[in-house]
Amino acid sequence: MGNHAMLLEKHTAVRKGRLHDGKVMVMRSNLRWCSDGLEFACWNGEVIRLAFIIDAFDREIIAWTAVANAGISGSDVRDMMLEAVEKRFHATRAPHAIEHLSDNGSAYTARDTRLFAQALNLTPCFTPVASPQSNGMSEAFVKTLKRDYIRISALPDAQTALRLIDGWIEDYNEIHPHSALKMASPRQFIRAKSI
Protein backbone atom coordinates (compact mmCIF):
# COMPACT_ATOMS: atom_id res chain seq x y z
CA MET A 1 0.00 0.00 0.00
CA GLY A 2 2.92 2.34 0.72
CA ASN A 3 4.23 1.87 -2.82
CA HIS A 4 0.93 3.10 -4.23
CA ALA A 5 0.58 6.11 -1.88
CA MET A 6 -2.44 4.55 -0.17
CA LEU A 7 -1.31 5.04 3.43
CA LEU A 8 -2.56 7.87 5.61
CA GLU A 9 -0.04 10.42 6.78
CA LYS A 10 1.18 10.06 10.35
CA HIS A 11 -0.69 12.12 12.91
CA THR A 12 1.65 14.96 13.84
CA ALA A 13 -0.53 17.22 15.97
CA VAL A 14 0.70 17.72 19.51
CA ARG A 15 -1.92 17.03 22.13
CA LYS A 16 -2.29 19.71 24.76
CA GLY A 17 -2.12 18.56 28.35
CA ARG A 18 0.95 17.33 30.06
CA LEU A 19 1.94 13.81 30.86
CA HIS A 20 1.67 12.71 34.44
CA ASP A 21 4.91 12.91 36.45
CA GLY A 22 4.24 9.67 38.37
CA LYS A 23 3.24 11.19 41.73
CA VAL A 24 -0.36 10.39 42.63
CA MET A 25 -0.77 11.17 46.35
CA VAL A 26 -1.49 14.78 47.32
CA MET A 27 -1.69 16.55 50.69
CA ARG A 28 -5.36 17.63 50.68
CA SER A 29 -8.65 17.03 48.91
CA ASN A 30 -9.51 18.58 45.56
CA LEU A 31 -5.95 18.99 44.27
CA ARG A 32 -5.88 15.91 42.02
CA TRP A 33 -8.72 13.74 40.82
CA CYS A 34 -7.94 10.43 39.14
CA SER A 35 -10.21 8.82 36.60
CA ASP A 36 -10.28 5.41 34.98
CA GLY A 37 -12.65 2.76 33.79
CA LEU A 38 -13.26 -0.95 34.01
CA GLU A 39 -15.49 -3.55 32.49
CA PHE A 40 -17.04 -6.75 33.75
CA ALA A 41 -19.31 -9.40 32.30
CA CYS A 42 -22.69 -10.50 33.57
CA TRP A 43 -23.63 -14.16 33.66
CA ASN A 44 -25.61 -13.86 30.41
CA GLY A 45 -22.60 -12.37 28.58
CA GLU A 46 -23.68 -8.72 28.66
CA VAL A 47 -20.82 -6.34 29.40
CA ILE A 48 -20.89 -3.38 31.79
CA ARG A 49 -18.39 -0.56 31.41
CA LEU A 50 -17.91 1.78 34.36
CA ALA A 51 -15.87 5.00 34.60
CA PHE A 52 -15.27 6.97 37.78
CA ILE A 53 -13.51 9.96 39.33
CA ILE A 54 -11.71 9.43 42.66
CA ASP A 55 -10.06 12.10 44.82
CA ALA A 56 -6.35 11.31 45.24
CA PHE A 57 -6.35 12.44 48.89
CA ASP A 58 -9.58 11.31 50.52
CA ARG A 59 -10.28 8.38 48.11
CA GLU A 60 -13.97 9.26 47.69
CA ILE A 61 -15.58 8.23 44.42
CA ILE A 62 -16.98 11.63 43.53
CA ALA A 63 -18.78 10.69 40.31
CA TRP A 64 -19.24 7.66 38.11
CA THR A 65 -21.05 6.53 34.99
CA ALA A 66 -21.89 3.08 33.66
CA VAL A 67 -23.23 1.70 30.40
CA ALA A 68 -24.27 -1.74 29.19
CA ASN A 69 -22.99 -3.29 25.97
CA ALA A 70 -21.40 -0.04 24.79
CA GLY A 71 -18.29 2.02 25.39
CA ILE A 72 -17.91 5.01 27.68
CA SER A 73 -18.20 8.05 25.40
CA GLY A 74 -16.62 11.47 25.62
CA SER A 75 -20.07 12.80 26.48
CA ASP A 76 -20.29 10.34 29.40
CA VAL A 77 -16.90 11.52 30.68
CA ARG A 78 -17.88 15.18 30.37
CA ASP A 79 -21.13 14.58 32.27
CA MET A 80 -19.14 12.78 34.97
CA MET A 81 -16.66 15.69 35.23
CA LEU A 82 -19.50 18.20 35.64
CA GLU A 83 -21.18 16.01 38.25
CA ALA A 84 -17.92 15.81 40.23
CA VAL A 85 -17.44 19.59 40.22
CA GLU A 86 -21.08 20.17 41.19
CA LYS A 87 -20.90 17.63 44.04
CA ARG A 88 -17.68 18.99 45.49
CA PHE A 89 -18.24 22.73 45.02
CA HIS A 90 -22.00 23.23 44.41
CA ALA A 91 -20.99 25.19 41.31
CA THR A 92 -20.34 24.58 37.63
CA ARG A 93 -16.67 25.54 37.90
CA ALA A 94 -14.05 24.56 40.47
CA PRO A 95 -12.79 27.55 42.50
CA HIS A 96 -9.18 26.57 41.79
CA ALA A 97 -7.40 24.39 39.25
CA ILE A 98 -7.66 20.65 39.91
CA GLU A 99 -5.45 18.16 38.11
CA HIS A 100 -7.59 15.54 36.35
CA LEU A 101 -5.43 12.45 35.84
CA SER A 102 -6.58 9.79 33.39
CA ASP A 103 -5.24 7.32 30.89
CA ASN A 104 -5.03 8.01 27.17
CA GLY A 105 -8.46 6.64 26.29
CA SER A 106 -10.23 8.45 23.48
CA ALA A 107 -13.08 9.58 25.75
CA TYR A 108 -10.53 11.48 27.89
CA THR A 109 -8.19 12.77 25.18
CA ALA A 110 -10.91 14.00 22.83
CA ARG A 111 -10.61 17.71 22.09
CA ASP A 112 -14.17 18.39 23.32
CA THR A 113 -13.43 16.65 26.63
CA ARG A 114 -10.16 18.53 27.18
CA LEU A 115 -11.80 21.89 26.43
CA PHE A 116 -14.76 21.05 28.67
CA ALA A 117 -12.40 20.06 31.50
CA GLN A 118 -10.58 23.37 31.19
CA ALA A 119 -13.89 25.25 31.31
CA LEU A 120 -14.60 23.48 34.63
CA ASN A 121 -11.11 24.50 35.87
CA LEU A 122 -9.86 20.91 35.62
CA THR A 123 -6.36 20.50 34.19
CA PRO A 124 -6.24 17.40 31.96
CA CYS A 125 -3.21 15.25 32.75
CA PHE A 126 -2.47 11.91 31.09
CA THR A 127 -0.47 8.88 32.17
CA PRO A 128 2.28 7.65 29.86
CA VAL A 129 1.06 5.12 27.29
CA ALA A 130 1.05 1.51 28.57
CA SER A 131 1.74 2.64 32.14
CA PRO A 132 -1.36 1.89 34.26
CA GLN A 133 0.73 1.99 37.45
CA SER A 134 1.02 5.76 36.91
CA ASN A 135 -2.63 5.98 37.93
CA GLY A 136 -2.27 3.66 40.90
CA MET A 137 -5.04 5.26 42.94
CA SER A 138 -7.59 4.40 40.24
CA GLU A 139 -6.11 0.95 39.67
CA ALA A 140 -6.39 0.20 43.40
CA PHE A 141 -10.07 1.16 43.35
CA VAL A 142 -10.66 -1.08 40.31
CA LYS A 143 -9.07 -3.99 42.17
CA THR A 144 -11.16 -3.29 45.29
CA LEU A 145 -14.40 -2.98 43.34
CA LYS A 146 -13.81 -6.26 41.49
CA ARG A 147 -12.64 -8.15 44.60
CA ASP A 148 -15.08 -6.87 47.23
CA TYR A 149 -18.21 -6.14 45.20
CA ILE A 150 -18.39 -7.54 41.66
CA ARG A 151 -16.96 -10.99 42.39
CA ILE A 152 -19.39 -11.68 45.26
CA SER A 153 -22.54 -10.30 43.61
CA ALA A 154 -25.19 -12.14 41.63
CA LEU A 155 -25.05 -10.57 38.16
CA PRO A 156 -27.51 -12.43 35.92
CA ASP A 157 -27.87 -9.52 33.46
CA ALA A 158 -26.91 -5.92 32.74
CA GLN A 159 -30.09 -4.46 34.22
CA THR A 160 -29.34 -6.10 37.58
CA ALA A 161 -25.70 -5.03 37.51
CA LEU A 162 -26.54 -1.41 36.70
CA ARG A 163 -28.96 -1.32 39.66
CA LEU A 164 -26.27 -2.64 42.03
CA ILE A 165 -23.47 -0.20 41.15
CA ASP A 166 -24.87 2.75 43.11
CA GLY A 167 -25.00 0.62 46.27
CA TRP A 168 -21.43 -0.60 45.74
CA ILE A 169 -20.12 2.95 45.35
CA GLU A 170 -22.11 4.16 48.36
CA ASP A 171 -20.79 1.28 50.49
CA TYR A 172 -17.22 1.97 49.33
CA ASN A 173 -17.52 5.68 50.17
CA GLU A 174 -19.29 5.25 53.54
CA ILE A 175 -18.07 1.95 54.99
CA HIS A 176 -15.06 0.41 53.20
CA PRO A 177 -11.91 0.94 55.31
CA HIS A 178 -8.63 2.16 53.79
CA SER A 179 -5.24 1.59 55.35
CA ALA A 180 -4.00 4.93 53.93
CA LEU A 181 -6.90 6.64 55.74
CA LYS A 182 -6.09 4.96 59.09
CA MET A 183 -8.81 2.36 58.43
CA ALA A 184 -11.54 4.96 57.93
CA SER A 185 -13.84 5.03 54.92
CA PRO A 186 -13.47 7.98 52.53
CA ARG A 187 -16.46 9.84 53.97
CA GLN A 188 -15.48 9.08 57.58
CA PHE A 189 -12.06 10.53 56.74
CA ILE A 190 -13.61 13.63 55.14
CA ARG A 191 -15.89 14.19 58.15
CA ALA A 192 -12.96 13.81 60.58
CA LYS A 193 -10.90 16.34 58.59
CA SER A 194 -13.72 18.91 58.62
CA ILE A 195 -14.08 18.91 62.41
Curated annotation (Swiss-Prot):
Single Gene Ontology MF annotation: nucleic acid binding
Domain annotation Integrase catalytic: ranges: 25-194
Tree of life domain: Bacteria
UniProt-listed GO biological process terms: DNA integration
Family matches, as InterPro entries: Integrase_cat-core, RNaseH-like_sf, RNaseH_sf, Transposase_IS3/IS150/IS904
Keyword Glycosyltransferase: no
Name of the protein in its database record: Insertion element IS136 uncharacterized protein Atu4601
Keyword annotations: Transposable element
PANTHER family for the chain: TRANSPOSASE INSF FOR INSERTION SEQUENCE IS3B-RELATED (PTHR46889), TRANSPOSASE INSO FOR INSERTION SEQUENCE ELEMENT IS911B-RELATED (PTHR46889:SF4)
